[in-house]
Amino acid sequence: MQELSEINGSIAAVIFKNDENGYAVVRIELDDGQLTTAVGCLPYIAPGEMISAEGSWTTHAQHGRQFKIEQCSRTLPTSPDAIYDYLAGGAVRGIGPATAALIVDKFGDRTLDVLEMQPEKLAQVKGISSNKARDISAGFKKQSGVRRLTEFLCSYGIQPIFALRMFKFYGSSAIEVVHENPYILASAHIGASFAEADSFALSLGIDGDSLNRVCAAVVFELIHNSGNGHCFIPREKLAAATSQLIGVSPELAHEAIDKLSETREIVCDTVAGLEACYLASLYDAETYTAERIKAMCASPAGKGVRVESLIARLERMGGIEYAPMQREAISLAAKSNILIITGGPGTGKTTILKAVLALYDELGLDTYLAAPTGRAAKRMSELCGMEASTIHRMLGAKMSEDGETVIFGKDEDDKLACDAVIIDECSMVDITLMSAILKALKPNCRMLLVGDADQLPSVGPGNVFSDMIRSGVVPTVHLTEIFRQKADSRIVRNAHMINRGEHPDFNENSGDFFRLRRLQGGSCVDTIVELCRRRLPENMKIPSYQIQVLSPSRKGETGTANLNKCLQAALNPPAEGKKEKPFGDVIFRTGDRVIQTKNNYDIVWKGKNGQSGTGVYNGDIGTITDIDTAEESVTVDYEDKTARYGFEMLGEIEHAWALTVHKSQGSEYRAVILALNPGVQMLLTRGVLYTAVTRAKELLIMVGDDSVAHRMIDNHKQSRRYSALRIRLADENS
């Protein structure tokens, strides 16, 4: 092992720094007066700081000899000259060289104490108001707190980004909080791996066989598996996974499960003869959902209507004739509190949805429309001619103060003011969200659930839509007939063939469905870029912003990560006047297409008509319109609203020229280019291909070897999800 070297000196200049991940390149004036370049984890570093660092000397191919810092201690400057350098170098927002000179002239070597302990005195300096003094002090305290926390966690190998998140949620008490519960680092809102949190905990002196450690591992396994779609884990599997994760005996894992069950952090229940272990929140969501749906199915609907005369009137008004299954759906909607409509593309789901809306209107019911994503809600609004919202917005979702859970404003104590609710793209709804919807409904509120059960299941836990259908308890209409206006679409025909396990002729390039191996002389990536940049805009008059590239995976040459880099370079290259912000291994640029990757219930947005609100949701796609380095913010235009992100929030957005198929769920695009990525085998399934094809409205082009598509059709393997909703609905557990 290479022996570490030590250097001591002061920061002479900051060449580069990224406050999101703490990485910095600095020039250090060593104690002997020499200047050297150093790189490493130095969050909020500024000129004038004193530093003592351990690391190793390396030679960079381009930048020459430099010192790679492994660990370090930093102290703030104490002399007036050094304090001036520190403040003038931009260490504290709101203080530039001129203001720094005035402050240091006034307070000398006491300046930093005044900033932290007596900020009101800053108002004695010309040009600094009381409000500005408070803002300056708050910024200084934040940076001091983050620096102390980061140095503490970095000394145990914890990345600076997690220190920044800890400080965001816990402020000045973050060190105390993480000492008390090291495993909070692995919670969803902080995001460190369990291995990192566990290593930190062991370094703090927690015993390897500590029951608290094993309990933390059990909870982690349940949380981790909920992210893979499971509502519960069989007890024996959970004990074995915990034992393997942290190297303890299965007996100790069972003891931890018992302890957690006693305190109801988890719930153990028997499901079809199997002992199932749930996170308490998922158990409550699943059991509530089952009981409420059974009650809706058992209770009679409210006042009726003469369905046949209504259907005849709707047919006359629309100049259409409903098919038998569509008539059945409308009749069922008239007499059911809850109804499911499922079918593939072109089977008339939208026609039924409009008819049911007319039915509810005839009954005098106030109806809300909602969908899981913003794009799906917008499409629903356009198709139905009335406002639809995201489910989260309808329920008034917001994040709890500790950042760990979602709180819904509409619930059992404050119901939605509607008599009926229609949910589209219901295959995307997980058990937690379905439970929240049901809790917000009045006792006699009706519910229509519309979706395609053959698409990919929800990202979150549960198999809600499929379980409800398979239970046989909920009235369900399966639409299978492809209607005349869609029958000529090869997108629709091929989608249904794929869903049945049949193999379309992908060499038949005609109509709205094409397959290209690659353009002559180029790779698959070159072909995709050329289609987006020139071929489709020029030859088919489809602008690039109406084209969506999809790939099964993030990884590989034709994965979304590489495709987005190539598409950004082609569609939005650097240019004079375009602003940029490096973040991690990507560069955000004005004009970039981006997608929100997690629900943010608190971010403020402004609407185009002057209205404002909070919340941008997973799957929302927009365009970067401004990057303000002074305010450290990025502005994203989401068509109907704009939202500003602080630089520390940029981990919530990604480039969106190319999306994974999973990310595209709930959306439709005028043109879809599907990269036949041969990479991750577990993602090459029939469901992924079917979902990708059904995203296209007017044109679908598959790029790559068609053998990949044929393999996907043959692979109908569906990962098992541990969910008991079907069993509970069908009363098979009694």
Question: Where are the language model's segments positioned?
Answer:
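Conserved helicase motor core of P-loop NTPases
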Residues: 349, 453-614, 625, 732
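ASCE P-loop NTPase helicase motor core
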Residues: 232, 327-330, 336-509
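Pre-Walker A segment
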Residues: 270-344, 351
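A generic structural signal for residues embedded in beta-strands
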Residues: 14, 53, 596, 624-627, ...
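Accessory, non-ATPase domains that flank or precede helicase/AAA+ motor cores in DNA-metabolism machines
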Residues: 1-306
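C-terminal accessory regions
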Residues: 500, 618-734
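Loop/turn positions that initiate beta-strands
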Residues: 48-50, 591, 619
